């Protein structure tokens, strides 16, 4: 989904988390929400925590690696690695969950030509303020 409205351009963290959380709920059931660990302009790192609190799901940040996904029973879990001051910590988290990913998470790669062509035709829902009903 794409959440885009000119009124949101200069929104503060308290407004942004409500907008994003509303969009997540509107999009339907989910198991995992991935987001950056912090905004590049404010370096705040608080929006993802507010979203997770509102959604009632655990949050782990900054994640450098997703090790395993276990959906063998009703309560699925993820095992992830997160950065700490002492190094790296291995954490198991119950799904649904939110992960704040670190720049160390992945080395970007180029998709095959077919993937690029399919991406160009993909329909991504774009929602504005009126679509979400947020103030």
Regions found by a protein language model. Give the residues of each.
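N-terminal glycine-rich FAD/FM-binding segment characteristic of electron-transfer flavoproteins
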Residues: 1-135
């Amino acid at each position: 989904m794409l959440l885009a409205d000119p009124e949101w351009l200069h929104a503060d963290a308290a407004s942004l988390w409500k907008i994003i959380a509303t969009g997540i709920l509107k999009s339907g059931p989910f198991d995992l929400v991935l987001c950056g660990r912090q905004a590049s302009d404010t370096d705040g790192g608080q929006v993802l925590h507010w979203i997770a609190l509102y959604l009632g799901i655990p949050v782990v940040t900054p994640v450098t690696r997703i090790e395993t996904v276990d959906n063998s029973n009703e309560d699925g879990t993820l095992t992830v690695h997160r950065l700490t001051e002492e190094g790296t910590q291995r954490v198991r988290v119950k799904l649904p969950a939110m992960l704040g990913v670190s720049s160390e998470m992945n080395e970007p790669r180029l998709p095959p030509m077919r993937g690029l062509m399919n991406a160009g035709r993909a329909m991504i829902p774009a929602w504005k303020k009126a679509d979400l009903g947020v103030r």
